[in-house]
From Swiss-Prot:
Annotated region (Activation segment), positions in chain: 280-293
Gene Ontology molecular-function annotations: ATP binding; histone H3S10 kinase activity; molecular function activator activity; protein heterodimerization activity; protein kinase activity; protein kinase binding; protein serine kinase activity; protein serine/threonine kinase activity
Protein name: Aurora kinase A
Protein source organism: Homo sapiens
Ubl conjugation keyword on record: yes
Mechanisms controlling activity: Activation of CDK1, appears to be an upstream event of AURKA activation. Phosphatase inhibitor-2 (PPP1R2) and TPX2 act also as activators. Inactivated by the G2 checkpoint. Inhibited by GADD45A and p53/TP53, and through dephosphorylation by protein phosphatase type 1 (PP1). MLN8054 is also a potent and selective inhibitor. Activated during the early phase of cilia disassembly in the presence of CIMAP3. Inhibited by the small molecule inhibitor VX-680.
InterPro entries (UniProt xref): Aur-like, AURKA, Kinase-like_dom_sf, Prot_kinase_dom, Protein_kinase_ATP_BS, Ser/Thr_kinase_AS
Gene giving rise to this polypeptide: AURKA
Ranges of Polar residues composition bias in the record: 27-83, 91-101
Length: 403
């Protein structure tokens, strides 16, 4: 298992004084609340102002000074003793009620402006609390917590709130999976991937703010209908292949594709959820055994290195289960299931058509290099003949450029 990386900014930030004008000095921290913090009379207020105009200081912190030089010397000593943990932004006006910054100075430093925006976003994430939400009915229960229907009080936005208990996460040693899920899912933007809007925590619990999928899981729908017809199966496979193509373009491998981790939006569209087993794969090679037994490919149960082709295997297992109603390698014992996967032993019922058999057989290859590309899956004749959704795999390059 790879551990989550923690980013930080270290080292003090030194201010430089431009020649022939007021001094440009960085504040050491951003105001975290709506009203500016009071300034001690013995400590000068540090602000960021353009070099060719007068300084902008909150009204309550203004005071007369006889010259710039003594103030600059005093501020330099304070800056040398202070470490700035994050990029900073301009202070708010005391009369301002909102959290919006003042009109920006002439944009002569794009990197500074970008750092300020990033800091603002990070601050907003840290401001969520349970009191900001109205909690509704439970949507589901898991090993480490529950999911509830919720509504954000100010915007009235409907969402799902996933509540996880820290003690249970620590006892199972899966904190790294949670960090991985947050890190990966919060950066993915695709119509067939469930959004993670943010997170917060208290002394005993961690809360994930998730997109609400009102039609529930694909697993529940499959249990209700026993199996899906070809049109519905091909449509789901198209949506899933589009989403996986986007993930792979971001160097993300899901590794745990199964009906329980697939949700349905208000229009019946499929959405991938639960990225706890996912990884960023800069080396494209993983050797960790994870995921659900019925969906594990041979290279993983045999302890061999694997790449994004594991998701292609899972796609084949999923297509089979949609059409037949059970996974292709299902057996009475774990040992027998392992053997059937390693030997790729499975059979088709008579009602499965030749086109579906051909696609599934291509995906369930023991050798990962022999499995088709996602583009080939989307262009397969059985998919194009039965799916009601278009392929957007051709947009892979443009999707990889999105944030």
């Amino acid at each position: 298992m790879d551990r989550s990386k923690e980013n930080c900014i270290s080292g003090p930030v030194k201010a430089t004084a431009p020649v022939g004008g007021p001094k440009r000095v960085l504040v050491t921290q951003q105001f975290p609340c709506q009203n500016p913090l009071p300034v001690n009379s013995g400590q000068a207020q540090r602000v960021l102002c353009p070099s060719n105009s007068s300084q902008r200081i909150p009204l309550q912190a203004q005071k007369l000074v006889s010259s710039h030089k003594p103030v600059q010397n005093q501020k330099q000593k304070q800056l040398q003793a202070t470490s700035v943990p994050h990029p900073v932004s301009r202070p708010l006006n005391n009369t301002q009620k909102s959290k919006q910054p003042l009109p920006s100075a002439p944009e002569n430093n794009p990197e500074e402006e970008l750092a300020s925006k990033q800091k603002n976003e990070e601050s907003k994430k840290r401001q969520w609390a349970l009191e900001d939400f109205e909690i509704g009915r439970p949507l589901g229960k898991g090993k480490f917590g529950n999911v509830y229907l919720a509504r954000e009080k100010q915007s009235k936005f409907i969402l799902a709130l996933k509540v996880l208990f820290k003690a249970q996460l620590e006892k199972a040693g899966v904190e790294h999976q949670l960090r991985r899920e947050v890190e990966i899912q919060s950066h993915l933007r695709h119509p067939n991937i469930l959004r993670l809007y943010g997170y917060f925590h208290d002394a005993t619990r961690v809360y994930l703010i998730l997109e609400y999928a009102p039609l529930g899981t694909v697993y529940r729908e499959l249990q209700k209908l026993s199996k899906f017809d070809e049109q519905r199966t091909a449509t789901y496979i198209t949506e899933l292949a589009n989403a996986l193509s986007y993930c792979h373009s971001k160097r993300v491998i899901h590794r745990d594709i199964k009906p329980e981790n697939l949700l349905l939006g208000s229009a019946g569209e499929l959405k991938i959820a639960d990225f706890g087993w996912s990884v960023h794969a800069p080396s494209s090679r993983r050797t960790t055994l994870c995921g659900t037994l019925d969906y594990l490919p041979p290279e993983m149960i045999e302890g061999r290195m694997h790449d994004e082709k594991v998701d292609l295997w899972s796609l084949g297992v999923l297509c089979y289960e949609f059409l037949v109603g059970k996974p292709p390698f299902e057996a009475n014992t774990y040992q027998e299931t392992y053997k059937r996967i390693s030997r790729v032993e499975f059979t088709f019922p008579d009602f499965v058509t030749e086109g579906a058999r051909d696609l599934i057989s291509r995906l369930l290859k023991h050798n990962p290099s022999q499995r088709p590309m996602l583009r080939e899956v989307l262009e397969h004749p059985w998919i194009t003949a039965n799916s009601s959704k278009p392929s957007n795999c051709q947009n892979k390059e443009s999707a990889s450029k999105q944030s």
